[in-house]
Amino acid sequence: MTTAQAQIRNQTMNHDVAQQALDRQEIIETVNKIGLMADLRNWAECRASFSDQVEFDYTSMLGGQPTTVSADTQIQQWKDFFATTFKTTQHLIGSHTLTLNGNTATCISHFQAHHVFRDTSKGKTWTLGGTYDHELSRTTKGWKVTKMKMTALWEEGTSPFSK
């Protein structure tokens, strides 16, 4: 290998490492932004994390099957539900583990979501903990979530979904 070839190889490797670091940071920010923007009720920014069609899987908590819906529809459902059900919420998401594969990625994270009810007849709060499994695709507008799976591992308080 010539010196010039070695320099080109090193530059390419450095670029790849830098791009991978940028991708990892953008993916983590995209995932974190979903919970934070929902908590801030900034639904446009929450929506910006998603592709146009997204598979949502809440079967560990709600039963049934995963559903694929437009992100706009899901955001509107969350907006309506949060407005009528919760005074405030706080989603803490961390311990991100990423797998990058070209223009697709997965991000598995722990979460803890604290919810303060408007109607306190079932209690003041509900806290849920578990994992998120996000699948993302690189787009011209950055990384977008194409699948979001929530696996509930524990909860305290009364779920708003309990009868």
Language-model features: where?
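A solvent-exposed, acidic/Ser-Thr-rich amphipathic alpha-helical stretch
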Residues: 43, 47-112
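Hydrophobic, well-ordered secondary-structure segments
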Residues: 5, 20-21, 25-27, 55, ...
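Intrinsically disordered, low-complexity regions enriched in Ser/Pro/Gly/Gln/His and often acidic
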Residues: 36-37, 71, 119, 135
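A beta-strand edge to alpha-helix "cap/lid" segment located at domain peripheries
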Residues: 2-15, 83-163
